[in-house]
Amino acid sequence: MEFKQLPPLAAWPRLLSQNTLRWQKPISEGLTLLLLVASAWTLGKMVWVVSAEQTPVPTWSPTLSGLKAERQPLDISVLQKGELFGVFTEPKEAPVVEQPVVVDAPKTRLSLVLSGVVASNDAQKSLAVIANRGVQATYGINEVIEGTQAKLKAVMPDRVIISNSGRDETLMLEGLDYTAPATASVSNPPRPRPNQPNAVPQFEDKVDAIREAIARNPQEIFQYVRLSQVKRDDKVLGYRVSPGKDPVLFESIGLQDGDMAVALNGLDLTDPNVMNTLFQSMNEMTEMSLTVERDGQQHDVYIQF
């Protein structure tokens, strides 16, 4: 193999000039052909785009077969009746069984003092003023006596029955000794009629006898004029008055069954703690001024012992 010697470096410019003139024509023809092809391709693409925009393309829509135009509401009654999670049953309160009151209960050993009682024909409206360690308070049926675990169970004219740890016990009225059980209230005697002989004298004699009994023990007034506390929304409205074991005094002073007592000797009976003050001053009373509401009007009733 023979190797030709390359021309010297100084001869390169001359050689390049000769070769350029020789290749100029083929290069120009190739570039011209390439430009023509590119122009034709661009023109064809523009024509295709314009024709495609003018031709409308139909919009596709699904074919509905066997379907109703109106939507039917979903029936969930079957699910509701299925009781998937069970049947809700509202819990029923267990009936309250009231235990009978033991009227001959033994005397209590608790250091309590019964200062006064307001016995009512409706046992739930009876009240008792009980002092424990020098502190007096008024209690209703089933209320727990402050400072103890005992609760008031029944109120009688001369005593109360308390339930202490499930055991009935008797608390006597202050100043009275424990005796035989208190008897039930005597039924109301027949009212005297004006056409009966000696009816008026008997009525007046009975009233005088009751006044004398009250003068000896002013708390006896509550055996002939019963007071029942009336509340609304935990607020004391007063005390409903009703005749006691003998209605002669009740009628003689002008009271009517259902009157609402709102004041007694100037004491506001709507005060929840007024009974404490009332029973403390009972033994010093010689007369009683009772303010009652009747048919929306107030009336003052005076009782002299």
From Swiss-Prot:
Periplasmic membrane side: 51-305
Keywords: Cell inner membrane, Cell membrane, Membrane, Protein transport, Transmembrane, Transmembrane helix, Transport
BP term (GO), one: protein secretion by the type II secretion system
Compartments (UniProt record): Cell inner membrane
PROSITE patterns documented for this protein: T2SP_C (PS01141)
Cytoplasmic side: 1-29
SUPFAM superfamilies: PDZ domain-like
Transmembrane segments: 30-50
Database matches in InterPro entries: PDZ_sf, T2SS_GspC_N, T2SS_protein-GspC
One of the record's GO cellular component terms: plasma membrane
Keyword NAD: no
Bilayer topology: Single-pass membrane protein
Domain of life of the native organism: Bacteria
Cited function: Involved in a type II secretion system (T2SS, formerly general secretion pathway, GSP) for the export of proteins. Required for secretion of cholera toxin through the outer membrane.
Family indicated by similarity: Belongs to the GSP C family.
The protein's name in its UniProt record: Type II secretion system protein C
Source species taxonomy: Bacteria, Pseudomonadati, Pseudomonadota, Gammaproteobacteria, Vibrionales
